[in-house]
Amino acid sequence: MGLTWLSVGLFIVAHDAMHGAIVAGRPGINKGLGSLALLLFAGFSWRKLIVKHMAHHRHAGTDDDPDFSRGGPLSWYIDFVRTYFGWREFWVLGGSVILYALILGPRWAYVTFWAVPSILASMQLFVFGTWLPHRPDHDAFPDRHNARSTRFGRPLSLLTCFHFGRHHEHHLTPWKPWWRLSRTSQPSGRLSRP
């Protein structure tokens, strides 16, 4: 569980870097740190993710949003994974596993300590950072961001997704890093506890 949470953290670092929130005014440092975090998380491409993530912010919760689906949670998650995990990621991860096995011999450590936590982290990020905040519901969204926030207290908010459940606040202030989202008031767009 701890490794899954740390894997979520790697993605959150990359996400904040996409918004220039790691080192304000230093896009090169943000890109470098974000690229490294994405590579360690699951072999993802910075270029591919930043383009899709900015499209998500421009078109949140609409058919033009690469993170959005009108299906149920399982089909939405499958679409979500297909959007971000392609042949490049497959070859980066596969090559890493082969290289690791050649250097250290066949072991299950890379599965236990990297692959499984990354897969579980993708599910956690999807549930708390995409599905809960952006799913169509009987309550209307508060504004064009088509995002809601969870009402978890700070400890649970940190554990679920590094305060990324404060998703409406994130869409209102994307330049704020994750550690400042917990201190952002929740003006509207609240979600009940799931």
Report residues per predicted region.
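Long, highly hydrophobic alpha-helical transmembrane signal-anchor segments
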Residues: 1-31, 93-94
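Hydrophobic transmembrane alpha-helical segments that form the core helix bundle
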Residues: 1-5, 60-158, 162
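Hydrophobic alpha-helical membrane-associated segments
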Residues: 5-10, 37, 41, 120
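Structural signature of transmembrane alpha-helix termini at the membrane-water interface
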Residues: 9, 21, 40, 47, ...
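Alpha-helical transmembrane segments of polytopic integral membrane proteins
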Residues: 10-14, 46, 125
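Membrane-spanning helices that line or support transport/gating and their immediate boundary helices
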Residues: 13-20, 52-55, 127, 131
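Residue-level micro-sites within transmembrane alpha helices that shape
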Residues: 14-15, 116, 133, 169
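Membrane-proximal soluble regions of multi-pass membrane proteins
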Residues: 24-76, 135-194
